[in-house]
């Protein structure tokens, strides 16, 4: 197999990267009806597999789980997840031949083996579904020409897919049809019905492509969504401890600060997040974020370049073939960082205190969101895709840090995201430590400005506000958030 994206000519690459259209609610008028009366078989029963299946069943679809015989015989967690929720569970050989739609929701590194195993069992004219297109785009999986290949990619962890559905809402979702596999022209009907079955149509669906989903998803998770949270947590904790701030307070400010700060981001973009600061703090955060953007732009661009070229995938798949030696080593190193081991504290931190004493975190979020967005759009990815993979998902990932620090983040995200996170953080951490943090004081991380006056120069404040509000991520964000007015509140601090 060879990288599918690299087999396309430049015009085809740009066309696929630029596929992104916000779909009208009317396009989902029939909701999941196209799949009713048909057999949906999910392979894999982890967070996405279980929660998508629960939603689809509640939407009136016939859902079952195909697991490896060993997983059934040994009653592994995937078997328990499906069985305890009342689903039909059986082997590949039993269920796959019955399926009209087979949905592969196993981890990325298992996709080639899973698809090669199930494809011979699939009946003529069936459909194969993915929630991430890595196997198709980066590994170049060749799929039988009689099979329709579709993607439904919820833009959040599986647990949120279920919780939002139970509220009568959903999560924003990318849907796509593989242009090489739509023999009957029914791909979009299948994808729309699957998305509606999960509830995604209520929050808004983007008509995308396998290529656009993969390239933007990899970029977001490696940089702002995971890598920046990891690097920022490590260097900020080190700075506070070195400058005499109590470890329990320092750790808690970071662990829950990311979540609280990005909650504001979720509802009103970078503009609202920055508006939560006093005027002097906003100006300071803006100045810091400008420094960070200048320092880190080459690193963001390198990650985008390596994703587009396929170099990232080649490197990661080489580690897969080497039993994940690098992944496991980096995971162990992360577990040994000072932030991961800070002592629990019952110190109370108010919501506003996370902003007042976490000015640096606000600066890092603004810089990271804008850098990721700019790198993606400069590479041909449309604004809508870039927004979802930079700003929109950030509160959801920050929520995992709040639960169990970086460990939880790296457990919840995919192995692909975790590997990319370490690649970024392993460079970003020493870069920040050596080139940025020496000039940072605890007035922006740990203690706050403590200003006696809220006075700032009017011209300076106007210029800062204009720069924040007129960034392209703010324009597209305002439009897309208008479709998600029923978003629930995630956090107000720990």
Swiss-Prot record:
Residues 14-208 form the KARI N-terminal Rossmann domain. It catalyses: (2R)-2,3-dihydroxy-3-methylbutanoate + NADP(+) = (2S)-2-acetolactate + NADPH + H(+); (2R,3R)-2,3-dihydroxy-3-methylpentanoate + NADP(+) = (S)-2-ethyl-2-hydroxy-3-oxobutanoate + NADPH + H(+). Keywords: Amino-acid biosynthesis, Branched-chain amino acid biosynthesis, Magnesium, Metal-binding, NADP, Oxidoreductase, Repeat. GO terms for molecular function: ketol-acid reductoisomerase activity; magnesium ion binding. Residues 209-344, 345-487 form the KARI C-terminal knotted domain. The active site is at 132. Mg(2+) 2 binds at residues 217, 389, 393. It holds the Pfam family KARI_C. Mg(2+) 1 binds at residues 217, 221. Binds 2 magnesium ions per subunit. Its cofactor is Mg(2+). One of its GO terms (cellular component) is cytosol. Substrate binds at residue 414. The keyword Transferase does not apply. The keyword Metal-binding applies. NADP(+) binds at residues 45-48, 68, 76, 78, 108-110, 158. InterPro entries: 6-PGluconate_DH-like_C_sf, 6PGD_dom2, KARI, KARI_C, KARI_N, NAD(P)-bd_dom_sf. Involved in the biosynthesis of branched-chain amino acids (BCAA). Catalyzes an alkyl-migration followed by a ketol-acid reduction of (S)-2-acetolactate (S2AL) to yield (R)-2,3-dihydroxy-isovalerate. In the isomerase reaction, S2AL is rearranged via a Mg-dependent methyl migration to produce 3-hydroxy-3-methyl-2-ketobutyrate (HMKB). In the reductase reaction, this 2-ketoacid undergoes a metal-dependent reduction by NADPH to yield (R)-2,3-dihydroxy-isovalerate. This is Ketol-acid reductoisomerase (NADP(+)). The lineage of its organism: Bacteria, Pseudomonadati, Pseudomonadota, Gammaproteobacteria, Vibrionales.
């Amino acid at each position: 197999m060879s990288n599918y994206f690299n087999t396309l000519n430049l015009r085809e690459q740009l066309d696929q990267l630029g596929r992104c259209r916000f779909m009208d609610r009317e396009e989902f008028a029939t909701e999941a009806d196209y799949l009713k009366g048909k057999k949906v078989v999910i392979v894999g029963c982890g967070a996405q597999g279980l929660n998508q299946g629960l939603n689809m069943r509640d939407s009136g679809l016939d859902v079952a789980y195909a697991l490896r015989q060993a997983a059934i015989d040994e009653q592994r967690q995937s078997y328990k997840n499906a069985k305890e929720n009342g689903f039909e569970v059986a082997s590949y050989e039993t269920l796959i031949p019955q399926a009209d739609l087979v949905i592969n929701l196993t981890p990325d590194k298992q996709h080639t083996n899973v698809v090669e195993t199930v494809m011979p069992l699939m009946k003529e004219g069936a459909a194969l579904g993915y929630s991430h297109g890595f196997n198709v785009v980066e590994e170049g999986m060749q799929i039988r020409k009689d099979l329709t290949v579709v993607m439904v990619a919820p833009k959040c962890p599986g647990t949120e897919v279920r919780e939002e559905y139970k509220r009568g809402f959903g999560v924003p979702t990318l849907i796509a049809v593989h242009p090489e596999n739509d023999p009957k022209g029914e791909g979009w009907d299948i994808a729309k019905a699957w998305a509606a079955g999960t509830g995604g149509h209520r929050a808004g669906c983007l008509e995308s492509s396998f290529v656009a989903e993969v390239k933007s998803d990899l970029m977001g998770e490696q940089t702002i969504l995971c890598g920046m949270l990891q690097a920022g947590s490590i260097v900020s904790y080190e700075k506070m401890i070195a400058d005499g701030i109590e470890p329990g307070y320092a750790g808690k400010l970071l662990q829950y600060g990311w979540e609280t700060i990005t909650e504001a981001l979720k509802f009103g973009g970078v503009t609202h997040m920055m508006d939560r600061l006093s005027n002097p703090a906003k100006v300071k955060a803006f100045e810091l974020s400008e420094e960070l953007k200048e320092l880190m732009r080459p690193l963001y661009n390198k990650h985008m370049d390596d994703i587009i070229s396929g170099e990232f995938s080649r490197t990661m798949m080489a580690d897969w073939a080497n039993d994940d030696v690098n992944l496991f080593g980096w995971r162990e190193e992360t577990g040994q960082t000072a932030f991961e081991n800070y002592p629990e504290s019952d110190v109370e931190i108010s919501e506003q205190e996370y902003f007042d004493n976490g000015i640096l975190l606000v600066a890092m979020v603004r810089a990271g969101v804008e850098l990721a967005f700019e790198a993606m759009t400069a590479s041909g990815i449309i604004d809508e895709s870039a927004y979802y993979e930079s700003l929109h998902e950030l509160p959801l990932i920050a929520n995992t840090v709040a639960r169990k620090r970086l460990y939880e983040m790296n457990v919840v995200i995919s192995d692909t995201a975790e590997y990319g996170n370490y690649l970024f953080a392993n460079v970003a951490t020493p870069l920040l430590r050596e080139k940025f943090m020496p000039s940072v004081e605890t007035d922006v991380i740990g203690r706050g400005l403590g200003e006696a006056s809220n006075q700032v120069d009017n011209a300076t404040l106007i210029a800062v506000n204009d720069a924040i509000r007129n960034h392209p991520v703010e324009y597209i964000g305002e439009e897309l958030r208008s479709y998600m007015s029923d978003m629930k509140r995630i956090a107000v601090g720990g």
